[in-house]
Curated annotation (Swiss-Prot):
The chain crosses the membrane at residues 127-147, 159-179, 223-243, 255-275. Residues 148-158, 244-254 are lumenal. It is found in: Endoplasmic reticulum membrane; Nucleus envelope; Nucleus inner membrane. Residues 243-254 are annotated as: Phosphatase sequence motif III. The modification Phosphoserine is found at residues 23, 30, 64. This is Polyisoprenoid diphosphate/phosphate phosphohydrolase PLPP6. One of its GO terms (biological process) is positive regulation of neutrophil activation. It holds the Pfam family PAP2.
Length: 289
C-alpha cells in the first residue's frame, strides 16, 4: 500500500494546518491560497486594467451599440450622418419614366419588322428604304435650290426662299438636339443609310420625321392642292415616320418627338417669314426673271 504524498512540512497533500482553518489567505500552503495568489496577479484584477478594458468596450464607443441578445463584444457598425444616406425610395416620376422607356424599347423592337432581310417583313425593306430617301435632306435641299433658280415670279421665289430657310433650320435644330441628347440608335438597326454625317449615329429626334412634318405643313399652307393631293401629303408624312421604326432606325419616342418638333418648326418659319420687305438683300440675288 502506497503512502500518501506529503508536502515539505511532512503533512499529507490536500490537508491544511489546523492553525489556518479560517480564511484561505492565512493558509500556509493550501491549494486555495495558491489559487488566490494566482488570481490576484492576473491582469484583470488590476483596477487600472479593468478601467482600460471598460473604456474600450463597444458600449463606450461613439456611434456603436451592442446587439440585442448578443454579448458585449458584438456591436453595430457606426451610423452614417443624415446627409450621407442614400434615399433608396425612388420617386413616382422616376418610376414612370423608366416604365415609359421600357415600353418604348419593347414596342420599337416589335415594330421593327423591316430591320433586316431576315425579319418578318424583310421583303418590304427596299420599299422602306426608297421611302427613306424621299425624306432625306439632300434631295429636298437640291430640289429647292433648283426650283428657286428656275422660278420666274416673285411669289414663287418668296415661297421657295422660305422653304429653303425651313430646311436649313430643320438641319440645324436636329443636329443640335442629337448632339446634346446622344441617344444611340436601336440595337437591331443596320447602318446602311443614304449619306450620313457624324450626328446621324444618334437617333433622337428622327430627322426624317421632323422634315416630313415641316414640309407637309408648309405645303398644305402655301400650295393650292386638290383634296386627294392634300391627303397624299399627310399620308406621306405619317408613313415616312412609321417607316423609321419599321426599318429599325429609330424608337417610337424619336418619331413622336420628331412630329412635334417639325410641327413647331413651321411655326417659327411662319413667324420669321422672309419677304422682299423683310429681307430685300436675299431677293435681289434672284431678281432676274
Amino acid at each position: 500500500m502506497q503512502s500518501p504524498r506529503r508536502n515539505a512540512e511532512g503533512r499529507p497533500l490536500g490537508t491544511c494546518d489546523p492553525s489556518s482553518s479560517g480564511s484561505p489567505a492565512h493558509g500556509g500552503g493550501s491549494r486555495f491560497e495558491f489559487q488566490s495568489l494566482l488570481s490576484s496577479r492576473m491582469p484583470g484584477a488590476d483596477p487600472t486594467s479593468a478601467r482600460l478594458r471598460a473604456s474600450e468596450s463597444p458600449v463606450h464607443r461613439r456611434g456603436s451599440f451592442p446587439l440585442a441578445g448578443a454579448g458585449s463584444s458584438q456591436a453595430l457598425p457606426p451610423q452614417l450622418p443624415e446627409e450621407d444616406r442614400i434615399d433608396l425610395n425612388p420617386s413616382f416620376l422616376g418610376i414612370a419614366l423608366r416604365s415609359l422607356l421600357a415600353i418604348d424599347l419593347w414596342l420599337s423592337k416589335k415594330l421593327g419588322v423591316c430591320a433586316g432581310e431576315s425579319s418578318s417583313w424583310g421583303s418590304m425593306r427596299p420599299l422602306m428604304k426608297l421611302l427613306e430617301i424621299s425624306g432625306h435632306g439632300i434631295p429636298w435641299l437640291l430640289g429647292t435650290l433648283y426650283c428657286l433658280s428656275r422660278s420666274d415670279s416673285w411669289a414663287g421665289r418668296e415661297v421657295l426662299m422660305n422653304l429653303l430657310f425651313a430646311l436649313l433650320l430643320d438641319l440645324l435644330l436636329v443636329s443640335l438636339i442629337k448632339g446634346l441628347v446622344r441617344r444611340r440608335r436601336p440595337a437591331h438597326n443596320q447602318m446602311d443609310m443614304f449619306f450620313t454625317i457624324s450626328v446621324d449615329k444618334y437617333s433622337f429626334p428622327s430627322g426624317h420625321t421632323t422634315r416630313a412634318a415641316l414640309v407637309s405643313r408648309f405645303i398644305l399652307n402655301h400650295l393650292v392642292l386638290a383634296i386627294p393631293l392634300r391627303v397624299l401629303v399627310v399620308l406621306w408624312a405619317f408613313i415616312l415616320g412609321l417607316s423609321r421604326v419599321m426599318l429599325g432606325r429609330h424608337n417610337v419616342t424619336d418619331v413622336a418627338f420628331g412630329f412635334f418638333l417639325g410641327y413647331m418648326q413651321y411655326s417659327i418659319v411662319d413667324y420669321c417669314w422672309l419677304s422682299p420687305r423683310t429681307a430685300p438683300v436675299l431677293f435681289v440675288l434672284w431678281n432676274q426673271p
